[in-house]
A protein has these predicted regions:
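Coiled-coil-like amphipathic alpha-helices with heptad-repeat character
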Residues: 1, 21-22
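Bacterial N-terminal signal peptides that target proteins for export
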Residues: 1-9
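Bacterial N-terminal signal peptides
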Residues: 10-17
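Beta-propeller-forming repeat regions
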Residues: 22-521
Length: 521
């Protein structure tokens, strides 16, 4: 009897140990440590992490609305980290002026960060600590709403001349307003802050799209690159199918007259659906060939600007091929030159979209992250029945000959969901970030709405040319239906990125005021 009892005890202990071990193993499989907090309003915008002077931890700016019966009030909430490494608490809450159309963050030379507000006729600054609003300047812009329906986060601020200071760029109908922050600015914010900027206008008009019944205006896309090899960034845009540049001169300002940069290949600065014929109609998609200049930046790591062109060939609405051509810049006698034919290109089955240029392994060369999906009749019918469509994620890398291979170095599948009843579509999570501070980015992909797969970045070694591990780590969590609501940022500035998640209208009601932070263990 004693022997039987002892045996039962041993079996019980073994089972307990096994179950406990499995539970611990399951717990260890979680890749991130999670923390969360809730706010007392509905979050409406992507969360904005910003650096604050003399603070190792970044501050979170959270935009949303307060609902009171039939009235909604837009507000900005400032959240700061407490002593606990993952907990954020409210520091200030500010109501936006009802005339605010758009906003951005602006860092002054004193390293103080303020909010830039744009209305239909003026620029103002908002102090996040005091809530005070100060007029910066009257401004002409293409945004002519006195009481906008919503507030947009727009890219109003950019270091356009490469001096390390934030500048302001506001499009108007005929010109581009450029406010250059100069190094002689005072170390404090006061009512004369406009004196800290050189105000100028570049002859870069808005993009006009006109049909027989309406006309619309949009921002002109621009680039800032050094194209004359004087060490200064120049202001570049596409005009009438030609590359046009305003050269940088003294004090970080730009020349008043533009210069044409001759290129040996044809391209457009407008997507094909904005190009109209003599009859005012858009292009015939049964016989369409179009090349759009997508980006100008150094891609192959030689510190010379390169050009990326998106090429579209269509023989029907459901029969379209999209590829990307890359023209690598060269310096000849102080001039930026390109070959007539593309140096390399990227093609893949399906329709390519959402291309991003990212240096995945910190070698100075850009990898290409791009998605692909089929839009044939059978795929559309299948998607309507299932409520989702498969989407491939590819990463292409330059080889030793500065050529993108025919096959991607990374290929995985995610799903894009949509609802016929609500008309809303979900987006998968597709994010690159460095979770362990080794300067090699990981790839994060969602699997449904409850799991992330993490493919660890790694060094290329002899016999192993892979940038990512073949097997993924897993993390289970409640993901937002819209993967764009997940962002990556190094919140405590330790070289390791965190994930910040919020939720939207496609998610459960109780999640709409919740913020989740994921930090690698």
């Amino acid at each position: 009897m004693l022997q039987q009892t002892r045996t039962l005890v041993l079996i019980s202990l073994a089972v307990t140990f096994l179950v406990s071990s499995q539970a611990i193993a399951k717990k260890k499989r979680q890749y991130f440590q999670e923390s969360s907090f809730t706010v007392d309003f509905e979050i409406t915008h992507p969360i904005i992490p910003i650096s604050i002077k003399n603070d190792d931890n970044k501050t979170l700016l959270i935009l949303g609305i307060l609902k009171d019966k039939e009235q909604t009030t837009p507000l900005l909430a400032v959240y700061k980290k407490t002593q606990d490494s993952l907990i954020y608490e409210i520091a200030n809450k500010i109501i936006f002026p009802e005339s605010t159309i758009a906003f951005d963050t602006l860092k002054l030379q004193s390293e103080k960060t303020i909010i830039l507000l744009l209305s239909s006729s003026q620029l103002s600054t908002l102090d996040m600590e005091t809530g005070s609003i100060v007029k910066l300047s009257d401004i002409d812009s293409i945004y002519l709403q006195d009481k906008p329906q919503f507030i947009a986060r727009k890219k109003l601020v950019k270091d356009v001349n490469g001096d390390g200071l934030d500048d302001i760029v506001i499009p108007s109908f005929k010109n581009l307003n450029v406010l250059i922050q100069h190094k002689e600015m005072r170390k404090r914010l006061d009512e004369n802050i406009i004196d800290n900027f050189y105000v100028s206008q570049l002859s870069i008009p808005a993009v006009v799209d006109m049909s027989s019944s309406q006309i619309s205006f949009s921002e002109q896309k621009y680039f800032t690159q050094d194209i004359n090899f004087d060490g200064l960034k120049d202001f570049i845009f596409v005009k009438d199918g030609k590359l046009t540049a305003f050269m940088q001169r003294e004090k970080g300002l730009f020349s008043e007259t533009s210069k044409i940069v001759e290129l040996p290949f044809e391209f457009s600065g407008l997507p094909w659906w904005l190009v109209r014929g003599a009859d005012g109609e858009t292009a015939d998609q049964s016989d369409l060939k179009h090349s759009l200049l997508e980006d100008i930046k150094d891609i192959n790591g030689d510190n010379i600007p390169d050009i990326m062109v998106r090429k579209t060939i269509s023989s029907g609405v459901l029969d379209r091929e999209i590829s990307y051509e890359f023209f690598f810049g060269e310096e000849k006698n102080g001039l930026l030159t390109f070959n007539k034919e593309a140096d390399t290109e990227i093609t893949a089955e399906g329709t390519l979209s959402d291309l991003k240029l990212i240096d995945m392994n910190n070698d100075g060369k850009m990898e290409v992250l791009v998605s692909s999906f089929d839009i044939g009749v059978s795929q559309i019918i299948g998607a309507l029945m299932s409520g989702s469509i498969d989407q491939d994620v590819f990463i292409f890398s330059l080889d030793e000959n500065n050529s993108f291979g025919e096959d991607p170095i990374f290929e995985e599948e995610v799903s894009l969901s949509f609802s016929l009843s609500s008309g809303q579509s979900g987006q998968p999570v597709i994010i690159s970030l460095d979770t362990n501070g080794d300067l090699h980015k990981e790839m994060l992909l969602s699997v449904g709405e409850k799991r992330l797969n993490i493919f660890r970045g790694q060094d290329k070694t002899e016999g192993n040319e892979e940038l990512f591990s073949s097997k993924s780590k897993r993390h289970k969590t409640k993901l937002p239906a819209n993967g764009n609501m997940v962002i990556a940022n190094d919140l405590n500035q330790d070289g390791r990125d965190e994930l910040i998640m919020r939720y939207g209208k496609q998610d459960d009601e109780e999640l709409k005021n919740r913020v989740v932070i994921l930090s690698a263990k």
